[in-house]
Amino acid sequence: MRHRHGLRKLNRTSSHRLAMLRNMSNSLLQHELIKTTVPKAKELRKVVEPLITLAKKDTVANRRLAFARLRDRDMVTKLFNELGPRFATRPGGYTRILKFGFRQGDNAPMALVELLDRPEVAEAVEVDGAAE
C-alpha cells in the first residue's frame, strides 16, 4: 500500500530526481518564473519554499544548509541577499503555480511556477507615430 508516502517519484531514480529538483530550484531562484509540468511544479514547491524560509534568517548555518541543497554559491547569495528580505514579512506561500495548458507533443499538463512579489519588468512600448 502507498499510504502516507510524501513524494512523487516522477518516473526517475532518486539521484535523478534529486538532481532535477536541484536544477529546477536553481532556475526558479535565478529567473523567478519557470514553465514545467504540473507534478514537477508541485514537487518543486516542496523544495523551494523551505529554502526561502531558511533565507529569512541570515546565519552561516542557514547558508550552509541552503548550499547543501542547491550546490550553487551564486543562488545562495541571491537567496539570502534578495529573496530572504523580500519575503521577511510573509509567513509562507512564496510561490504560485498557474496551470498553463498542455504540451504539444505528449499533452502533458503544463504549469508556470513563479515567486510572488516579483519586481515588474518594464516592457518596450511601440511607438505608433513611426508607422505613419
UniProtKB/Swiss-Prot annotation:
InterPro entries the UniProt entry points to: Ribosomal_bL17, Ribosomal_bL17_CS, Ribosomal_bL17_sf
Similarity annotation: Belongs to the bacterial ribosomal protein bL17 family.
Pfam family, one: Ribosomal_L17
Keywords from the UniProt entry: Ribonucleoprotein, Ribosomal protein
Name assigned to this protein: Large ribosomal subunit protein bL17
PANTHER family: LARGE RIBOSOMAL SUBUNIT PROTEIN BL17M (PTHR14413:SF16), RIBOSOMAL PROTEIN L17 (PTHR14413)
Molecular functions per Gene Ontology: structural constituent of ribosome
GO annotation (BP), single: translation
NCBIfam families assigned: L17 (TIGR00059)
Family annotation (SUPFAM superfamilies): Prokaryotic ribosomal protein L17
